[in-house]
């Protein structure tokens, strides 16, 4: 690319001499008129070659150099396998297990929402449930009848499953090869005749289809264990320690409360929004999260291309309350003092109800209390269950900064090899000496601009975690 100007000059000379019959006189005339500027033109050409070389380095530094330094496609395959391993590990944590019980609920969700919606930090949520700072994932009732007797309610609870039934054959995975689920490597299932982009898409779809099938098998295994425990307790009259007694079932569900978001019935107490005191089940709470990184409409023109925007203006807006739209959504939870069961509590099978009074239903709303600040020690916020939100924001800023640097390099490269440069060369060749100063200054500006972007992109590549990019203003 650095030799482009010289090549264009040679072609221009050839075209001029061909049109004029190869006259040596014409060529000598042009040569003599340009003798004074030949030295300066050579210097300008050298500067242009350096500048265009910088463009090449800038365009390749974001991809080729990193690929070479990390082993190219082998590195990308390792990264893909590691991501798959983490996704599978997360899905395994979402399996409901009968022995992982807290106060009559569980550490994993019932399954009212799809896997894509359950992208919270599972260890963090499970820790909050064990600490009794967040309500457990209760198995919900589709309906609740105030007229149910104790025996009827216990029978309904006995019929509940650990997890909602899965869709066996989702339409999106129809015809997708699964292979041997016991073999982790799925590259052999990918059609190698496809383009690289299509191969990546197919690989992602195969992985998701296999993961869906694995989740079904994992949960079916736990469901079978749970059913066997129930049958054994019915046959012998001795319940497993993790199975709730009839008193526990009665006390849990006799005052069922409806979640105003999913409209399912759950045992009380439930989580309560910190701002407007509305009840919300844990499975609905973990769906609520910050907006994806975006630009503020007040500071950035929406019509402006993303690569022209300042990456530091990219923001992540805190989640708002789904009931009253208060920012920094969070909940509080007051665990039942007389029903500490399961992990860090007594065996659910030995629970005995403190009283046998008939169920009472609140006819008056609970007394109001003031809201609690989002940074209060008793509040669990949406950000707490997704602690990597700031890292994701910085990654998006880094990605945008790299795109902007590449776009600038391409723009500068196009200006260096402007077609107008060759068209006007023969007309202005005689006056090259007078225009050299301005051309040299322009090329120097290009070179300085590219050096800045090369250095910026180099910093981004040297620090993959984007610590070199200032986080800028972050909404909390």
Curated annotation (Swiss-Prot):
Region (Disordered): 1-48, 351-379
UniProtKB keywords: Cytoplasm
Domain of life: Eukaryota
GO cellular component labels: cytoplasm
Chief location bin: cytoplasm
Single GO BP term: cellular response to glucose starvation
InterPro entries: Sip5/DA2 (IPR039301)
Cellular localization per UniProt: Cytoplasm
SS bond list: none
Family recorded in the similarity comment: Belongs to the SIP5 family.
Function, as annotated: May negatively regulate the SNF1 kinase.
PANTHER family: PROTEIN SIP5
Name recorded for this polypeptide: Protein SIP5
């Amino acid at each position: 690319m650095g030799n482009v100007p010289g090549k264009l000059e040679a072609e221009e000379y050839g075209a001029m001499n061909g049109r004029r019959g190869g006259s040596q006189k014409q060529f000598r005339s042009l040569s003599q008129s340009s003798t004074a500027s030949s030295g300066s033109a050579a210097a300008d050409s050298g500067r242009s070659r350096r500048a265009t070389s910088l463009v090449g380095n800038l365009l390749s530094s974001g991809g080729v150099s990193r690929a070479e330094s990390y082993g190219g496609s082998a590195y990308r395959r390792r990264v893909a396998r590691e991501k798959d391993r983490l996704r599978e590990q997360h899905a395994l944590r979402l399996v409901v297990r009968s022995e992982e019980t807290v106060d009559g609920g569980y550490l994993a969700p019932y399954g009212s929402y799809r896997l894509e919606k359950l992208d919270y930090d599972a260890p963090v949520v499970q820790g909050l449930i064990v600490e009794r700072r967040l309500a457990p994932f209760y198995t919900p009732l589709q309906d609740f009848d105030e007229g149910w007797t104790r025996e009827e309610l216990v029978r309904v609870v006995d019929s509940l499953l650990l997890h909602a039934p899965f869709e066996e054959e989702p339409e999106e995975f129809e015809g997708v090869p699964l292979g041997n689920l016991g073999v982790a490597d799925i590259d052999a299932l990918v059609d190698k005749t496809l383009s690289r982009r299509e191969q990546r898409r197919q690989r992602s779809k195969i992985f998701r289809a296999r993961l869906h099938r694995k989740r079904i098998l994992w949960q079916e295994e736990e469901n079978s264990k749970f059913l066997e425990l129930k049958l054994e307790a019915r046959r012998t009259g001795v319940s497993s320690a993790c199975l709730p007694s009839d008193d526990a079932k009665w006390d849990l569900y006799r005052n069922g409360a409806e979640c105003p978001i999913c409209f399912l019935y759950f045992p009380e107490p439930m989580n309560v929004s910190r701002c407007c005191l509305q009840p919300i089940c844990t499975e609905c709470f973990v769906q609520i999260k910050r907006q994806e990184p975006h630009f503020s409409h007040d500071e950035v023109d929406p019509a402006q291309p993303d690569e022209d925007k300042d990456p530091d203006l990219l923001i992540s807006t805190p989640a708002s309350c789904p009931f009253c739209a208060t920012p920094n959504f969070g909940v509080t939870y007051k665990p039942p003092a007389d029903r500490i069961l399961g992990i860090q509590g007594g065996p659910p099978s030995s629970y005995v109800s403190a009283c046998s009074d008939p169920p009472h239903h609140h006819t008056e709303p609970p007394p109001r209390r003031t809201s609690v600040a989002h940074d209060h020690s008793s509040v669990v916020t949406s950000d707490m269950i997704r602690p990597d939100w700031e890292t994701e924001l910085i990654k998006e800023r880094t990605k945008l900064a790299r795109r902007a640097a590449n776009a600038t390099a391409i723009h500068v490269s196009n200006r260096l090899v402007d077609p107008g440069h060759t068209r006007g060369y023969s007309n202005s060749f005689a006056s090259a000496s007078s225009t050299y100063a301005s051309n040299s200054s322009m090329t120097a500006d290009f070179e300085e601009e590219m050096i800045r972007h090369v250095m910026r992109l180099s910093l981004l590549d040297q620090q993959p975690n984007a610590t070199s990019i200032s986080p800028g203003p972050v909404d909390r």
